[in-house]
Amino acid sequence: YYRDNHKQKEDDNTVVLNVDSTLETLSVDPERIKSAILEHTTRAAENYEYPNSFSLDIPFVSQYPELPTGCEITSLTEVLNYLGYGIDKETLARNYLDMRDTVTQGCFVEYFWGSPWKTTGSGCFAPAIANAANSFLKSQNSSYSAYIMSYSPVEDLFTELSLGHPVIVWTSYNYNDPDVKYNDVTLDDGTVFTWPRNEHCAALSGYDIDRGVVTLADPTYGIVERSMEEFVTYYQKYYYQAVVVR
């Protein structure tokens, strides 16, 4: 699984995250990662208290064998299937996911670098998947829309889920490796982008506060439980990336 090709380094054009810092002290240009806007609006319902446990029956869709590096678009396929759309992962990737072969400005954020059909494909972040989702939903004249939730606290992810809104989250491909490593990728405009190895994506389908677990519809591993502590740690280390469809 080739999620270990790419990262970023510090100079005048660098976009770097200190993964050991808190959200408030992240050393990053947030507009770059958030694609200029944070669209999440759950905080408008401040009086809402999410329950201690909740789950949605989001189906498992395997990314294999067709999309060995297509966990992001496959996670979106799971969510759209849950919402009643019979779209398959390859059609979604082929027609709605913006992909580029070269390292140009916006790499990993606005589009998928490489091809999800190839083991040498790299990946993408929340804006690329939100854009793919909205392109598809618009083509269906759907009342649903996708919203970027990046940098939202985990509690907001649970709030959205408990309101019946499926959430896509970025996490680690390898929960046995707590030390996330990073590679440097120099974009065509000179910006150096930090890419986390083992970057992975899944649909958040449930949580249980009392048991300390979350449930993921994971395109690689199936319907799996992860400890709350591990989930939160990797959510932070993979730049707090998330998308909600509602």
Spans of model-derived segments:
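A mature extracytoplasmic/lumenal domain signature
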Residues: S75, S150-S152, T171-Y175, G206-D208, ...
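Noncatalytic regulatory segments and standalone regulatory/sensor domains
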Residues: N183-P196, A202-R246
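Active-site-adjacent structural segments surrounding the nucleophilic cysteine of cysteine proteases
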Residues: Y1-A132, Y173-Y175, K181-V185, V192-W195
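Short, solvent-exposed, low-complexity loop/linker segments
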Residues: F158-V167, T171-D179
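Loop/turn elements at helix/coil->beta-strand transitions in domains of secreted/extracellular proteins
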Residues: Q140-Y144, L163-I168, R211-G212, Y240
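Structural recognition of the beta-strand scaffold that forms the well-ordered cores
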Residues: G70, A146-I148, V167-T171, A203, ...
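Mid-length scaffold segments of soluble, non-membrane domains
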Residues: P116-E155, T159-L163
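Short, surface-exposed beta-strand/loop "edge" segments at domain boundaries and coil↔beta transitions
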Residues: E155-D156, N176-K181, I223-E225
